[in-house]
């Protein structure tokens, strides 16, 4: 199969987490959607492409070391952020200004959590002796595009649902974390 076509398919698969997280953030963010879309596209696209290259550079020796706990880290980060969003959504009281989800730490955590699979893809490129520069660029670009789409579609839904969208966003992030754990612990037959 052609490397570019395969890279597009891999990019779409990896971008689904970026899309879901961007949707949740877009729905939660009340203002500055252009800024939100730009920041998430930059971070998510950059991290997806960068982690693909990093995985390739580190090679197969590192895969065994990180495989034992990568899913716990990614899921834990998503559970923390998702749980905070759910709690914010169920708090009684008047509508508060949305928290600044675009501080560096929050965006960094989300970017790392959504790009750990890209690290594994890069490791597989290393094992297959594929130089991943073009695939990493394609993966990063697709993730950036999906991130922009997620912010804008989440923003449209956010206006309809109001404060309940915090709960929806938190549930989405938590479900992504659960999916990551199920993939590694159940569906792949891996142990804890």
Swiss-Prot record:
Keywords: Cell membrane, Ion transport, Manganese, Membrane, Transmembrane, Transmembrane helix, Transport. The chain crosses the membrane at residues 3-23, 38-58, 61-81, 101-121, 130-150, 167-187. InterPro entries: Mntp/YtaF, Put_MntP. The keyword Transcription does not apply. It is a multi-pass membrane protein. It comes from the Archaea. It is found in: Cell membrane. GO terms for cellular component: plasma membrane. One of its GO terms (molecular function) is manganese ion transmembrane transporter activity. Disulfide bonds: none annotated. It holds the Pfam family Mntp. Probably functions as a manganese efflux pump. PANTHER family: MANGANESE EFFLUX PUMP MNTP-RELATED (PTHR35529:SF1). Belongs to the MntP (TC 9.B.29) family. This is Putative manganese efflux pump MntP. The gene is mntP.
């Amino acid at each position: 199969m052609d490397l570019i076509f395969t890279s597009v398919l891999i990019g779409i698969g990896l971008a689904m987490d970026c899309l879901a997280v961007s949707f949740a953030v877009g729905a939660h963010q009340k203002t500055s959607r252009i800024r939100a879309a730009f920041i998430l596209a930059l971070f998510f696209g950059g991290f997806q492409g960068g982690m693909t290259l990093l995985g390739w550079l580190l090679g197969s020796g590192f895969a065994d070391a990180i495989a034992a706990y990568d899913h716990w880290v990614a899921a834990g980060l998503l559970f923390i952020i998702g749980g905070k969003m759910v709690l914010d959504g169920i708090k009684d009281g008047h509508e508060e200004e949305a928290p600044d989800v675009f501080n560096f730490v929050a965006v960094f955590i989300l970017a790392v959590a959504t790009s750990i699979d890209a690290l594994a893809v890069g490791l597989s490129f290393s094992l297959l002796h594929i130089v991943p520069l073009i695939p990493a660029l394609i993966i990063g670009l697709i993730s950036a595009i999906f991130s922009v789409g997620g912010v804008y579609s989440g923003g449209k839904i956010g206006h309809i649902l109001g404060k309940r969208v915090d709960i929806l966003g938190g549930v989405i992030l938590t479900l992504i974390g659960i999916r990551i754990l199920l993939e590694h612990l159940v569906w792949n037959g891996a142990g804890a």
